Amino acid sequence: MGRIGIGLTLVVALAAGCTPVVPRPAVTFAVLAGSYYSAQGDVAVEAAVVEDSERLLERAVADVNARRNVNFVLVAGDLLARAEPLSLDRARAMLDELRVPYYVVLGEHDGLAPPPRMGTGSEEAERAGGPARLPGGAGVSRSTVLWTFQGHGISGPQGYWVRKVPPGIVVVGLDTVNPGRHGGHVDARQLAWLDETLSQHQWQMVVIVAHHGLVPLHPLDEGAAWEHLLVDNAGEVREVLERHPNVVMVVTAHHHFAGGRIAGRIVYLASPSISVWPMAYHLVRINQQEAEAVWVPLAPPALARRGQERLLGSEQYRGVFPEGEDGDTACVRLFGGNKMTVYRLPTIRP
């Protein structure tokens, strides 16, 4: 099957405003997500080229390091294909090669966390899309992954955190993983913490990173096919965010494609996957007037073709589109689109 090419530039405008009351310093950051790294390369993940995950993650780190203007990196979940010690150690070592600070939130693949009323790694949990115990009992827990990345946003046993980062902004990491489920959830305790945290930083620009989406980005998000890509109580989370006008952007990564929209004066940006076609990472720039997101491809041509073929063979992603060439084109247009998106930003008035 030949590779289908697509590229779009989208400009989205918000209500016009004058100089922001809250300082909005110019900042550039990268978003690395969905690397599905496996040290052995032998884990099956829907549509992902796991066998080349090490090469792709290394290329992402090298590309970020080659850029002089990147302030920090957000690792937006599903770093691992499967939670196992060697993969975790190697992934951490590769991220430690970054020359700028990096901050981590977890995805549902990043550690074993069986839900209540289900045995660890039960068939029921596995069917629900959650992580399962590895053969022979091998594997690492979410708490182990959290402790591995202490100091990279994470501080203590919780998966949510807040950090002041140069050049003078605040980054908030949310833990949207709902153990044993593919979809996300933010519980009442974390919501209360989020509200209080945003109030404490009301005079600073805030960027939020989470794994699961908080707004629908495609009609399929509102049906059974893709509803698991979102936080199941996303409305409650947005209600908290919209009380705090200093929140400029929410970055997520569970959709695996580059996309975004504006809701309640906040830019909701979805970043592509490193190991699912188009095998890319996001480079995001924010200044006083606008936010720009560009995805940066990582795969050489032969690997990119293989990745696209795997995407088009995926029941979860390609299977929801009509059969035939029109369906192929629609799938590729979605996953390979939004090469660059620009959002006009409003005045921030706490």
Which residues fall in each region the model found?
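Short, flexible/disordered intra-domain loops and linkers
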Residues: D42-E51, P115-G129, R133, P219-L229
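A short C-terminal boundary segment appended to hydrolase-like catalytic domains
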Residues: Q288-P350
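Extended active-site neighborhood of metal-dependent phosphoesterases/phosphodiesterases
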Residues: P85-D195, E236, I262-A270, M279-R285, ...
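Bacterial N-terminal signal peptides
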Residues: G5-A15
